[in-house]
Regions:
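Conserved beta-strand segments of the P-loop GTPase G domain that flank and frequently precede/overlap
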Residues: 125-129, 161-163
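Membrane-proximal basic amphipathic "stem/tether" segments
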Residues: 222-282
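Short acidic, S/G/P-rich loop/turn micro-motifs used as interaction or catalytic elements
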Residues: 15, 95-102, 129-138, 167-168
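Well-ordered, non-membrane alpha-helical segments in soluble/globular domains
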Residues: 99-111, 134-149, 202
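Extended, charge-rich low-complexity interaction segments
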Residues: 180-232
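Adenosine ribonucleotide-centric catalytic and binding domains
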Residues: 9-73
Length: 282
């Protein structure tokens, strides 16, 4: 088992970050946590260039409209970089009104990641490939890792775990681990009416991470439960006696915006699932 002092997600989706979070390996939100990445190389190149053009208003185009549990999410895509933003805008909170606040939020997350990459000594990056894309080559993975290492010259260790979909897997399996680049196959694709969904089953991914790595200062199970309980307490306090049925509740929306909680399409009831937000509350 290898030990790191910082782990972060490069994408492709929120499933990678959620796998780290549920093990206590990550608490604060970072740029790639709630976005859709077009590729591993696109993510590392974005890190290398300091996220230039990441959220340029002129490049954002409405890409999809998703109906989730009574909530209508408006998905925007950056047509220059290929990154998608699925969790930021809705019919009730359109981009024309929310763009500045969302941009400021991502600026905080970008600054947070930059500080960590400049100061940490043992860094792990995780990329969970899209379940509908094939595995990329070892050369592409090694090249991506080289870009990351160039960005962190002070670090003693910068490793990359690349996980891709293989429906035959009953348990995540390491295929190769050379010079800090580890390739893992796992089954995490899910289906709805015979079609692959964008939501991943993280059980095999989380199981592999739990058995393979440790993070200095990771939250224990007791701390995770306490963290979750505190978020529910703050939610109840902010809502008074109101009962929450949908994400579109006005007071819940404001609380989520303030703390950057992702609750799209979920019913919020005690014990439902952990709530995650930026650790500084900004």
């Amino acid at each position: 088992m290898k030990t790191y002092d910082f782990a972060f997600s490069l994408g492709f989706s929120c499933a990678a970050s959620e796998s780290l979070r549920e093990l206590g390996f990550q608490k604060e939100s970072l740029p790639f946590d709630w976005t859709g990445a077009p590729s591993l190389r696109a993510s590392v190149d974005m890190v290398a260039c300091g996220f230039a053009g990441w959220f340029d208003r002129d490049a954002l185009r409405l890409w999809d409209v998703r109906h989730e549990g009574g909530f209508i999410a408006r998905v925007y895509k950056n047509m220059k970089t290929g990154f998608g933003f699925s969790h930021e805008f809705s019919n009730a909170d359109p981009i024309e009104r929310s763009y500045d606040a969302v941009r400021e939020k991502y600026e905080r997350r970008i600054s947070r990641l930059g500080r960590e990459l400049k100061t940490r000594r043992r860094i792990l990056a995780l990329y969970l490939e899209s379940p509908v894309k094939p595995r990329i080559s070892d050369g592409e993975i090694s090249a991506a890792l080289a870009v990351l290492r160039a960005k962190c010259p002070q670090a003693e260790v910068v490793d990359l775990v690349y996980i891709y979909e293989d429906e035959t897997c009953k348990k995540a399996e390491v295929l190769s681990s050379v010079a800090g680049a580890t390739v893992v196959r796992a089954h995490y694709r899910t289906y709805l009416d015979g079609r692959p969904m964008h939501i991943c089953d993280r059980s095999q991914v989380a199981g592999f991470l739990r058995e393979s790595i440790s993070i200095d200062g990771a939250l224990t199970e007791a701390q995770l439960r306490a963290f979750d309980a505190e978020k529910r307490r703050r939610l109840r306090a902010s809502l008074g006696t109101n009962r929450v049925n949908r994400w579109v509740n006005k007071k819940l929306k404001q609380w989520c915006r303030d703390l950057e909680v992702y609750l799209i399409g979920q019913k919020l009831i005690p014990g439902d699932r952990p709530l995650w937000f930026d650790g500084d509350g900004k």
